[in-house]
């Protein structure tokens, strides 16, 4: 199937199989900006739309061969829900829509340029899906569920099911902590995140304690400017984008875990799967956020963890 991210990967690295995270839209170079513009304005709702024809063809065969009477579609990528809608219309079966993240309110769309007609088309796709589905599942809290309800033309079954983690796979990974106090962050860190407060905390610590034996271990994608800012404050170890098993190993090596909520996500109050995996490690967690009611509820499962905002410095 055709995906713009494959072309982007070939151009950047010469390898179309090199992974680019779903929620990561690089905009550092001129080519990045062009690719971002194309991705956000020509591929609606997302760059994975190119596989829909092939996915529907395969799904049709599976449904016919196995007498399937219920389908669950999960996103992002939200293009998968458009496959589900086509299946629903073709076979008249039960359809559950699983929103792992918001759709039209998706965090990385807020500070990116999209034509108004594109925004309207994306919203139309979402409304068509939500109003067709028999039930809706979200991983986020009551505030986002209210946003969904406002979009519905009739009452739907809306359920909240948090992300989870694979305990068996998690427990197989050995816990090895370094001698230095190890602060860990895994995932994507961009200018859309609430990281400035943590930089302020590190500055205060650096000024007050000159010989702190402390490191900041990072795994994932990070904006180059942000990486430089942290490198000035603390010994920064960048592991780059790693597979899930390596990410869990890094999480389990922590003395403290850091989570940065996305800016402008106060209404949706997202609870990531990463936060659940953080909790499973048993390490203390600081969640930096302006407003994280749902995250606060989750973090109450650990007496050593809390959410922090500018009033806590």
Regions found by a protein language model. Give the residues of each.
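A conserved catalytic-core segment of Leloir-type glycosyltransferases
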Residues: 1-53
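Short N-terminal targeting/anchoring amphipathic segment
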Residues: 20, 26-29, 55, 59-80, ...
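Membrane-proximal helix-turn-helix segments that form the acceptor-binding/catalytic region
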Residues: 79-82, 86-90, 103-104, 116-136
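Acidic donor-binding loop of glycosyltransferase active sites
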Residues: 134, 251-269, 283
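Conserved donor-binding/catalytic core segment of Leloir-type glycosyltransferases
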Residues: 137, 176-193, 199-202
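Carbohydrate-associated surface elements
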Residues: 142-143, 161-164
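Nucleotide-activated donor-binding/catalytic signature segment of Leloir-type glycosyltransferases, i.e.
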Residues: 209, 213-249
């Amino acid at each position: 199937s055709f995906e713009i991210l494959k072309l982007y990967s070939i151009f950047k690295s010469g390898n179309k199989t090199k992974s680019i995270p779903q929620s990561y839209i690089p905009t550092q170079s001129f080519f990045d900006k062009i690719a971002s513009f194309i991705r956000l304005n020509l591929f609606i709702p997302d760059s994975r739309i190119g596989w829909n024809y092939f996915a529907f063809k395969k799904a049709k065969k599976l449904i016919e061969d196995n007498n399937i009477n219920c389908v669950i579609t999960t996103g992002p990528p939200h293009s998968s829900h458009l496959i589900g809608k086509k299946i629903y219309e073709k076979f008249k079966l039960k359809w559950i829509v699983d929103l792992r993240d918001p759709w039209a309110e998706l965090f990385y769309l807020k500070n990116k340029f999209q034509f108004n007609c594109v925004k309207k088309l994306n919203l139309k796709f979402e409304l068509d899906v939500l109003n067709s589905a028999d039930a809706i599942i979200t991983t986020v809290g009551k505030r986002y569920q209210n946003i969904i309800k406002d979009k519905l033309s009739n009452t739907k079954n809306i359920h909240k099911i948090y992300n989870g983690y694979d305990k068996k796979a998690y427990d197989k990974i050995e816990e090895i902590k370094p001698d230095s106090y190890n602060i860990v962050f895994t995932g994507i860190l961009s200018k859309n995140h609430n990281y400035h407060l943590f930089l302020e905390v590190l500055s205060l610590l650096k000024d007050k304690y000159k010989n702190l034996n402390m490191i900041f271990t990072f795994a994932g994608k990070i904006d180059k400017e942000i990486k430089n800012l942290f490198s000035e404050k603390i010994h920064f170890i960048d592991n780059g984008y790693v597979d899930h098993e390596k990410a869990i190993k890094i999480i389990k090596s922590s003395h403290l875990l850091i989570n940065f909520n996305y800016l402008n996500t106060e209404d949706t109050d997202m609870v990531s799967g990463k936060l659940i995996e953080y909790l499973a490690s048993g390490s203390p967690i600081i969640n930096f956020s302006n407003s994280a009611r749902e995250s606060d509820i989750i973090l109450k499962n650990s007496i050593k963890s809390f959410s922090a905002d500018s009033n806590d410095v």
